[in-house]
């Protein structure tokens, strides 16, 4: 039977304490934000709120959800995240499947792989990208937020390395049963690669949900902005024109901002626990080459 040595136990205790401290440091700002959003106007403006609400009220959340532009931005972000993640998983997994084959199966594979890798080092630039979106007529279109980042080379490489770990005998068995590449991809590769796919889904979801710069460039009008871009105009630029002046006069801007930030962070916080069990496994296996 394996017995843990004293140095190992001390090291483990130290690690647990360190991770606990880091976790608390990460959670405290979010918890403080929640307390500010649930506090009354006067103590929030005076900076008296720490880790317990003063004058408990949910008025900031009521006014936030009464704001039509905020709800429109929230819906745009939901659509962008759902459709953008689904399309990215489809495109990147198909590309990774093709690139995981050797040159005997996919001629020119190395050339295509280098073509993808070069895009990680050099981008097309902001102005050419805007001109392209403009010429395609995608300004104020949801596709303008999805298509430019649809192909993520890092995710393709992660999946490619994962696909290479799939035993070739499984694929050969499906071919002997009369299946083609697409059938093999659906029935063999996708189920086995669930940890890597879940990891990429999490990366893509977080990227779409938190992206704000492209919304400011490609979307015109506050009613067309995704949530991150909408909050950027309010929090960073101080633009509160989307709110009723009476709301601004009677409610602290600090509590309003805190409620919006917390609402914006909540969806990812709720999704992550369901995907985190795949996260480490997907990264480790996808990063290893044979």
Where is each model-derived feature located?
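A hydrophobic, multi-pass inner-membrane permease signature
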Residues: 2-290
């Amino acid at each position: 039977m394996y017995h843990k040595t004293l140095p190992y136990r001390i090291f483990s205790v130290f690690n647990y304490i360190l991770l606990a401290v880091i976790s608390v440091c990460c959670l405290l700002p979010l918890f403080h934000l929640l307390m500010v959003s649930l506090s009354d106007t006067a103590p929030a403006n005076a900076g008296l709120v720490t880790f317990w609400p003063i004058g408990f009220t949910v008025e900031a959340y009521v006014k936030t959800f009464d704001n039509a532009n905020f709800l429109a931005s929230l819906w745009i972000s939901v659509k962008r995240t759902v459709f953008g993640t689904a399309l990215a998983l489809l495109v990147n997994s198909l590309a990774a499947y093709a690139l995981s084959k050797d040159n005997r199966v996919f001629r020119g594979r190395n050339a295509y792989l280098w073509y993808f890798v070069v895009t990680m080092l050099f981008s097309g630039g902001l102005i050419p990208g805007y001109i392209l979106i403009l010429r395609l007529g995608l300004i104020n279109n949801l596709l303008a937020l999805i298509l430019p980042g649809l192909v993520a080379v890092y995710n393709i490489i992660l999946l490619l390395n994962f696909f290479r770990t799939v035993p070739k005998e499984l694929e050969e068995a499906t071919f002997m049963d009369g299946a083609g590449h697409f059938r093999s991809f659906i029935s063999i590769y996708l189920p086995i690669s669930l940890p890597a796919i879940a990891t990429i889904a999490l990366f893509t979801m977080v990227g779409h949900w938190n992206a704000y710069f492209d919304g400011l460039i490609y979307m015109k009008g506050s009613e067309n902005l995704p949530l991150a871009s909408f909050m950027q105009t309010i929090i960073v630029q101080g633009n509160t024109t989307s709110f009723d002046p009476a709301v601004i006069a009677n409610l602290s801007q600090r509590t309003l901002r805190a409620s919006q930030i917390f609402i914006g962070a909540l969806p990812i916080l709720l999704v992550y626990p369901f995907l985190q069990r795949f996260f480490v496994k997907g990264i480790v296996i996808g990063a290893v080459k044979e």
